[in-house]
């Protein structure tokens, strides 16, 4: 008989035993061979077998391997994730540190705030002391000394007449700053009707080198030649002053001290604005300047400037109107007899300077427009140029002067003037400052050799310094000294008063101090504006740390009034006109214009 399935010994079975308990309690595992006979598996095949030997043993379960692989994979993913996280975090930290460093560096740099204002490309020439020669003292004061001299540019065979303004050794840092501020303003302007700065010398004492004028200041000139000044000259001067002021307005510069004394005469046909001691440059977004104090010309100032210390181009227009009035009255003193402390109340009540006898109503109405309380109602300088230019084409129609057609101003040649001015100098190489600078395309570029000697010119073309006045002979008219260190200073030179009177000095009433004085006596600093001080006279003065300048217009000028004070002193003063030159003059210490403790009456 044949088994249907498998043979296990003597038995027929459906399947070979797998894990059946056999002899000696051992497990028996068998497999079916090719003849379907059950054979014993290899002892090492603990889970049965499919064939003989170890080869027949079945492979182990894959589940642990899969589990191990999954776990290992997960661990790898975690490690990779941590690595990526650490990398990103490190990158974030580096970026954060970089941004922090950039922000810190940016804080060290000022933020950009473009103003849209054109750059000031003016050049300032720094001169060596060996390049100029001092010839003669023009004047001295508390600020230092002004010399007449020659500028001899290094490497060139030319000599240029100049005025040298030198601060004294003991000058304060504030005075040095102010003179450098004036140098900045003067170096920033370049116009035929504005005085220019030739250079600056930075020695132990700062020195400004400016043009030298042959005819002095316009105020002296019209007083000396009032019988020979015709309508055409007066109107032409008005046009030129307006042109100079219009140029300053275009440069956003407020002059703050326009007056006939601050206009210099180059020739009878050519005048220039000077004295930038109070001038201020406005920023691109500034419409006005607020002053803090100092000596100011009260009788030339607009009402808003007196009351609120607000200065604009339109306040300069007011001063222009007063300057025109000075010209039309041949140097009369504005508001004569009225104390400076009362000017504001007088103006608020509607009073103005009277119509000059030679002026038609056309000319006077222009002045009146300049003195409107509302600054915006005053004419612009470009409008004043147009008005006076029209009048200058037909002078007798607008100014009525007796014998006008026969009037003629003297005009000495340069040769005569400079031989008088520089008696001991060789005249062959003398060149006018304008003639020297004209060939230069830049303001102060490299020197040019194409110049015409001054001796060949037939009209005087020299210039005075920004604050000096001398006459055609170099010694008749006084010279104005530094306008912001001496003239606007509270520092007295009172110990010179008696000797100054003996030498013919007189106080001038244009300026009053706005700064708080250290002591009341500082109000009585003498100012000798229109008297010449010779070298002999200077030698008689006591030699101490202060100097008295006979050519200043405002050391103690009463129109420069102090508004930085507490309540106005109620003393009433009287003073004679400062241009009176005869007699034994005594300085009236009760001059109302010499008050230090001043506030406008309306403000007290």
From Swiss-Prot:
Enzyme Commission identifier(s): 2.7.10.1
Organism: Avian erythroblastosis virus (strain ES4)
Any one GO MF annotation of this record: epidermal growth factor binding
Function (record text): The v-erbB oncogene transforms avian fibroblasts and erythroblasts in culture and induces sarcomas and erythroleukemias in chickens. It is a truncated and mutated version of the receptor for epidermal growth factor.
Enzyme class: transferase
Family: Belongs to the protein kinase superfamily. Tyr protein kinase family. EGF receptor subfamily.
Domain Protein kinase: 132-399
Keyword set includes Kinase: yes
Plastid as UniProt keyword: no
Residues holding ATP: 138-146, 165
This protein's GO CC annotations: plasma membrane; receptor complex
BP term (GO), one: negative regulation of apoptotic process
Protein name as annotated: Tyrosine-protein kinase transforming protein erbB
Matching PANTHER family: EPIDERMAL GROWTH FACTOR RECEPTOR (PTHR24416:SF91), TYROSINE-PROTEIN KINASE RECEPTOR (PTHR24416)
Active site: 257
Sorted UniProt keywords: ATP-binding, Kinase, Nucleotide-binding, Oncogene, Phosphoprotein, Transferase, Tyrosine-protein kinase
Disulfide bonds: none
Pfam families: GF_recep_IV (PF14843), PK_Tyr_Ser-Thr (PF07714), TM_ErbB1 (PF21314)
SMART domains (UniProt xref): TyrKc
InterPro entries: Egfr_JX_dom (IPR044912), GF_recep_IV (IPR032778), Growth_fac_rcpt_cys_sf (IPR009030), Kinase-like_dom_sf (IPR011009), Prot_kinase_dom (IPR000719), Protein_kinase_ATP_BS (IPR017441), RTK (IPR050122), Ser-Thr/Tyr_kinase_cat_dom (IPR001245)
Catalytic activity: L-tyrosyl-[protein] + ATP = O-phospho-L-tyrosyl-[protein] + ADP + H(+)
């Amino acid at each position: 008989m044949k088994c249907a399935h498998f043979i296990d010994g003597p038995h027929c079975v459906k399947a070979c035993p797998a894990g059946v308990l056999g002899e000696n309690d051992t497990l028996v595992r068998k497999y079916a061979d090719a003849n379907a006979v059950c054979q014993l598996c290899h002892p090492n095949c603990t889970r049965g077998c499919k064939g003989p030997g170890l080869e027949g043993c079945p492979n182990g379960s894959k589940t642990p391997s899969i589990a191990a692989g999954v776990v290992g994979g997960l661990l790898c993913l975690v490690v990779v994730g941590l690595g990526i996280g650490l990398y990103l975090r490190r990158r974030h930290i580096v970026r954060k540190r970089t941004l922090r460093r950039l922000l810190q560096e940016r804080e060290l740099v000022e933020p950009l705030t473009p103003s849209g204002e054109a750059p000031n490309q003016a050049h300032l020439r720094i001169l060596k002391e060996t390049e100029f020669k001092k010839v003669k003292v023009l004047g001295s004061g508390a600020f230092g000394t002004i010399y007449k001299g020659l500028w001899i540019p290094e490497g060139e065979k030319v000599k240029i007449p100049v005025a040298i303004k030198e601060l004294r050794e003991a000058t304060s840092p504030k005075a040095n700053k102010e003179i450098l501020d004036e140098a900045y303003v003067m170096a920033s302007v370049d116009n035929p009707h504005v005085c220019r700065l030739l250079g600056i010398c930075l020695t132990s004492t700062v020195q400004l080198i400016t043009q030298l004028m042959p005819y002095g200041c316009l105020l002296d000139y019209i007083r000396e030649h009032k019988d020979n000044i015709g309508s055409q000259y007066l109107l032409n001067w008005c046009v030129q002053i307006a042109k100079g002021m219009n140029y300053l307005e275009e440069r956003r510069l407020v002059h703050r001290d326009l007056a006939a004394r601050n206009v210099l005469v180059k020739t009878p046909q050519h005048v220039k604005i000077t004295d930038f001691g109070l001038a201020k440059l406005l920023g691109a977004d500034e419409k006005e300047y607020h002053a803090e104090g100092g000596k100011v010309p009260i009788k030339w100032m607009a009402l808003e400037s007196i009351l609120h210390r607000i200065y604009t181009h339109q306040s300069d227009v007011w001063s222009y109107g007063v300057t025109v009035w000075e010209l039309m009255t041949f140097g009369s003193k504005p508001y004569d007899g009225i104390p400076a402390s009362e000017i504001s109340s007088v103006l608020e009540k509607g009073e103005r300077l009277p119509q000059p006898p030679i002026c038609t109503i056309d000319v006077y109405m222009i002045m009146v427009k300049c003195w409107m309380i509302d600054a915006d109602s005053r004419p612009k300088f470009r409008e004043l140029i147009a008005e006076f230019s029209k009048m200058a084409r037909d002078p007798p129609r607008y100014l009525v002067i007796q014998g006008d057609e026969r009037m003629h101003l003297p005009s000495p040649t340069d040769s005569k003037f400079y031989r008088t001015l520089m008696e001991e100098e060789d005249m062959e190489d003398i060149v006018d400052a304008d003639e020297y600078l004209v060939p230069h395309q830049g303001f102060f570029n490299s020197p040019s050799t194409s110049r015409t000697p001054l001796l060949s010119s037939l009209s005087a073309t020299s210039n005075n310094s920004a604050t000096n006045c001398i006459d055609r002979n170099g010694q008749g008219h006084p010279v104005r000294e530094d306008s912001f260190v001496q003239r606007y200073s509270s520092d007295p030179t009172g110990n010179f008063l008696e000797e100054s009177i003996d030498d013919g000095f007189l106080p001038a009433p244009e300026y009053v101090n706005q700064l708080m004085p250290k002591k009341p006596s500082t109000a009585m600093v003498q100012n000798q504006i229109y008297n010449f001080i010779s070298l002999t006279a200077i030698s008689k003065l006591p030699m101490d740390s202060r100097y008295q300048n006979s050519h200043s217009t405002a050391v103690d000028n009463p129109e420069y009034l102090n508004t930085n004070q507490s309540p106005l002193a109620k003393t009433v003063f009287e003073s004679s006109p400062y241009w009176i030159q005869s007699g034994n003059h005594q300085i009236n210490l009760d001059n109302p214009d010499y008050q230090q403790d001043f506030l406008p009456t309306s403000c007290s």
